[in-house]
Amino acid sequence: MKNDNRIIKNTIKQFKEKLCKDFSQKANITSITRKLAVFIDTILIQLFIKNKLHFGDNFCLLALGSYGRRELQLHSDIDLLILHTEKVSNIQLQRAQKFIQDCWDVGLEVSHQITTVSSCANLASQDLSVISTIMDMFLLCGHGALMEELIYQTHTLHMWPSHQYFFAKLQEQQNRYAKYGETAYNLEPNIKNGPGGLRDLQILLSISKRHFKIKKLAEGIGYGFITDKEYEELKYCQNFLWRVRFALHMLAGKPEERLSFDYQVKLAQFFGYQDQSHILAIEQFMKDYFKVIKRNRELNEMLLQWFNETIVYHQKQKIIRLDDEFQLSNRFIEVRNNRVFKQNPQSILKLFYWLVKRPDIEGVRASTIRLIRESLFLMGKRFRESKETANIFINIFRTGNDPYDALQRMNRYGVLAHYLDCFATATGQMQYDLFHAYTVDQHTLFVIRNISRFKKNEYAKQFPLCAKIITALEKPEILYLGALFHDIAKGRGGDHSELGAIEAQQFTQRHYMEAEDSKLIVWLVRYHLLMSQTAQRKDIYDPKTIEQFCQLLPHARYLDYLYLLTVADICGTNPTLWNAWKDSLLKELYHAAKTRLHKQQELLDEAALISIRKQYAMDILISDGISSRVIQDLWSQFKGKYFLHESPEVIARHTKAILNSKQFPVVIIMPHHSQGGTEVFIYMPHKDERFTITTSVLSNHHVTIQEAAIITCDNQFDLDTYIILDENNQAFLNEQRARDIQKNLCDHLANTGRLPAVSRRRLSRALTHFNVKTQINFIDDNTNHQTQLFLVTNDRPGLLATISRVFLTLNIHLHNAKIATAGERVEDMFYISNQTGYSLNHEEKTILKEKLILEISKSKY
């Protein structure tokens, strides 16, 4: 008996191998899934007969779910229902259990239920998933009358009337979207359960079956539920997703449903995508994938809405006229007749203008969505060059209301891509990294959504400065249009900011915008990264940095637009990207630039600035009862750079801590003055190893360094400041943890023995799939006798500790560091000098570069 099962198991293995070979040779996926279902039928029937369950009228074997629909994927579960009469004996039930055991023994992943018709019907009346799978049942073997009785007992006359079933399935989909629509699932989408995935197709078939009593979705054409073209589109989406899913199962060797990063690479290779100069094979594959799920989701939304309007609420219409072309039906906008778009194609855009102008409109009627999709061909060259069209499109952004929902719909219905060729190119474009969580088109719309949120009271507490600025903004439409074009050229190769600026220039000319408005929009697109790069890579406390930044702003008002776009852009790139530290950096840069641009502060020389900050700090300390002479004696040992970098409040706090200290090192952990991070302040006799010790200890405590300022005083004491964040990129809240770090730093900095070992930590699963080539560039800063080292590499635990050890080995002195992490990519800036205090020469740079690359490659664990 066991030998028979072994033979069957081997037969199944060989058959699946043959199917995989056929699939690899581009066999039709529908044929393959059906062949597999039919083959499994023969195995199950054979085992059913072997266990003598086919005699008489006591048992019935049914295939359910995708297996019942004859759509079996390579490693999908095989859903079975064994119905039996009330009078079966225990021996017969044991045979049924033995049948299931045989299924498992031959390697079939079987999910099963052994029950009576009445029990099954009772369960179906209470469980949505049960009634849904029953609707797909297919008779394999046994007494068919049992199946017919189950069909009768689960009919809409007895349970789950179509409207109740519809709303339950709709809620189920909303719950699924909430679960699988998160960022992680966007980077590594679930092909079965994710938004736009196969479940979105199955719900359309389910509600059609329940209401129209049809067996296939194609039969819904005759009921007006779906058009021929829409059916063909859905069929295309289904076949694409089936092919990807079959290949995923084949490559994984198991029922894998998630397109994780490693499988994305393998799938792109399997389907024949090849890297191009400006776009990776994986990005091409995922672009096609995202386009398909976007189309699938769009059709799902439209057809479910059609069902709701036509079947559920068909007798409850309240009509309100808007104009000659549009009206509201139960708060949903619709055309007043089906010739509107043909007679006046500009009305396609006008509909979306109404959506922005009237925020009380809840959506677009399904019949009108269908008409929009059928009318997209009218949006040709003549349409796009029309001045009337241009005015309507610009007015969408000029109403003063939130345009996000209207633009989101324009994107879903294909209107934006038909109106803007450059947007069509960007649609579905994904970047293969952990930094960008969304496709370019979705990210763009999220940035626009974020701008609109700055105006809303519920976001004023989270973004107070943005809320203040945007209320005084003269022309918000400029900001919206800058956002629309800021990433429009991603995926083409070259500098997307420059290419996007060209697109923006052409757009503003075609839309008859005023010269000054056009100039600002183009500038925003070209320089949309300026503020974030300045804040994260440069010393924003240095007046020269502020002066250089301001010189790139043609007018003071440009700063307001740029700040708002920068915040909206960061928040719309990845939900984990924005934190209090980035917030504080951008605010400080904004305020410093604002002061300089409005001439409230003339460009002072360093000596004057130092004098002002010293005086403010002195006033604070004297008010605390500290002698001015004691303060001046201490300050006389500090470098001028320290007073430029720190605010008067921080200078006073550091000074007080040093003067109150009874021993060295002085280590203080406290909130940074901006409250965006946690500050680690260290004052101690000079020690070359201190940077290495500090980075090693902090790495072992799983904190990340955002900034470091390293200063050796004239009295040969070191005065170092670090800004750190916890694992969640937030300032520390745990006082005990801060005390533990403080104690460890004190112990190791005071110790003259070995350097602290850096604890080894594994890379996260996601990080292991990315390989950022280590790049090192040097720029000499002759004014300060320093060399700027710009490092790009893979993020990994303990990276900064590794770098610090290289600096120590080669006698490289660090003066300042700016640390920036974007997903798997680290972009760090170090201001360094050699052991004599000067910029590195060519030989020193070469040795440092080679040593860093070697040690970084060894530290990837």
From Swiss-Prot:
Check the record and name the InterPro entries matching this protein.
ACT-like_dom_sf, ACT_dom, GlnD_Uridyltrans_N, HD/PDEase_dom, HD_domain, NT_sf, PII_UdlTrfase/GS_AdlTrfase, UTase/UR
Hydrolase: is it a keyword of this entry? yes
Q: Sorted alphabetically, which keywords does the UniProt record give?
A: Hydrolase, Magnesium, Multifunctional enzyme, Nucleotidyltransferase, Repeat, Transferase
Q: Where is this region: Uridylyl-removing?
A: 322-678
Q: Please report the stretch or stretches of sequence annotated as the ACT domain.
A: 679-760, 788-861
Residue numbers spanned by region Uridylyltransferase: 1-321
Its needed co-factors are: Mg(2+)
- Could you say how this protein's activity is regulated? Uridylyltransferase (UTase) activity is inhibited by glutamine, while glutamine activates uridylyl-removing (UR) activity.
Instruction: Give GO BP annotations, semicolon-separated.
Output: regulation of nitrogen utilization
Reactions catalysed according to its record: [protein-PII]-L-tyrosine + UTP = [protein-PII]-uridylyl-L-tyrosine + diphosphate; [protein-PII]-uridylyl-L-tyrosine + H2O = [protein-PII]-L-tyrosine + UMP + H(+)
Recall the GO molecular function terms of this protein's record. [protein-PII] uridylyltransferase activity; phosphoric diester hydrolase activity
- State which Enzyme Commission number(s) the record gives: 2.7.7.59, 3.1.4.-
Top-level taxon of the source organism: Bacteria
Which SMART domains is this protein grouped with? HDc
Q: Where in this chain does the record put each HD domain?
A: 440-562
Function summary: Modifies, by uridylylation and deuridylylation, the PII regulatory proteins (GlnB and homologs), in response to the nitrogen status of the cell that GlnD senses through the glutamine level. Under low glutamine levels, catalyzes the conversion of the PII proteins and UTP to PII-UMP and PPi, while under higher glutamine levels, GlnD hydrolyzes PII-UMP to PII and UMP (deuridylylation). Thus, controls uridylylation state and activity of the PII proteins, and plays an important role in the regulation of nitrogen assimilation and metabolism.
The record, for PANTHER family, names: BIFUNCTIONAL URIDYLYLTRANSFERASE/URIDYLYL-REMOVING ENZYME, BIFUNCTIONAL URIDYLYLTRANSFERASE_URIDYLYL-REMOVING ENZYME
Which HAMAP family did the record assign? Answer: PII_uridylyl_transf (MF_00277)
Q: Which NCBIfam families is this protein grouped with?
A: UTase_glnD
Q: What is known of its domains?
A: Has four distinct domains: an N-terminal nucleotidyltransferase (NT) domain responsible for UTase activity, a central HD domain that encodes UR activity, and two C-terminal ACT domains that seem to have a role in glutamine sensing.
| Similarity field | Belongs to the GlnD family.
Q: What is this protein called?
A: Bifunctional uridylyltransferase/uridylyl-removing enzyme
| Gene name linked to the record | glnD
